[in-house]
Regions:
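Extracellular/periplasmic periplasmic-binding protein-like sensory domains
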Residues: 17-95, 106, 153, 174-180
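Short, glycine-/Ser/Thr-/acidic-enriched flexible segments
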Residues: 11-12, 39, 154-157
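Hydrophobic alpha-helical
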Residues: 3-24, 100
Length: 181
C-alpha cells in the first residue's frame, strides 16, 4: 500500500500494458496511476488485454477539469454543434488562451512580445473564461486546477471509461463519485 506506479504516456500505454500483462495480470499488486495523456485513450478500451490490465490494476487517470459555467456551456454547445462530439477539457483552455492573448495585445497596445508579457499575468488574473479563473504562478503556469478522475470499467465483455471522482485543489481533497476498485 506504499508503492504505486505512475505511468505518464500517450497511446503507447496500450502496448506497454499488453506487455505488462504477460508478466503480471494484476500489476504486481500495486496501484497504477496515469496522466492526462492516458485519460480517455480509445486504444485502452479497444484492446482487451490492455483494458483488462487497466481494469484489474484500478488504473486511475486525472485530467484537467474546467469550471462549468455559462461560458463553459457556450463553448461546449458550439463544439458539439460543429464537430458532433463534446470537447475535451483542453478545448476550453485553448479557447481561453486565445482570449487572454488577444486581451493582452489590446492592453499592451503594442505588438511587442515584451509589452504583452508584462501585462499578460494581470490580464489572465482578471479573466474568467470557459475553463474558469486563470491565475498564473511565477513560472506562467496555471497556479491551481481541479482534476477529473477516470478509470476503465468492465461491462460484460467490453470496457469503457468511467468517471469516478474529482480532485479539488482548493480543499486538497478528492470527492469520489464512485470509488475505484
Amino acid at each position: 500500500d506504499k508503492v504505486g506506479v505512475l505511468y505518464i504516456a500517450f497511446e503507447e500505454v496500450v502496448e506497454f500494458f499488453t506487455e505488462c500483462s504477460v508478466y503480471s495480470s494484476d500489476g504486481w499488486g500495486v496501484k497504477w496511476y496515469g496522466s492526462d495523456g492516458t485519460t480517455m485513450s480509445a486504444g485502452l478500451i479497444a484492446y482487451t488485454t490492455a483494458a483488462a490490465f487497466s481494469y484489474t490494476t484500478g488504473f486511475i487517470n486525472p485530467i484537467f477539469s474546467p469550471t462549468q459555467s455559462d461560458k463553459w456551456q457556450k463553448v461546449h454547445d458550439e463544439v458539439q454543434n460543429v464537430l458532433g462530439r463534446a470537447p475535451d477539457s483542453y478545448t476550453y483552455v485553448a479557447y481561453d488562451i486565445v482570449w487572454v492573448l488577444a486581451l493582452s495585445l489590446l492592453e499592451a497596445d503594442a505588438h511587442d512580445s515584451g509589452a504583452v508579457r508584462a501585462v499578460l499575468p494581470t490580464v489572465a488574473q482578471n479573466y474568467f473564461g470557459a475553463s474558469g479563473w486563470i491565475v498564473l504562478d511565477e513560472n506562467g503556469d496555471r497556479a491551481s486546477a481541479d482534476y477529473d478522475l477516470w478509470i476503465i470499467d468492465k461491462l460484460d465483455t467490453t470496457y469503457e471509461w468511467k468517471y469516478v471522482g474529482k480532485y479539488v485543489q482548493a480543499t486538497d481533497s478528492i470527492i469520489w463519485g464512485t470509488p475505484p476498485p
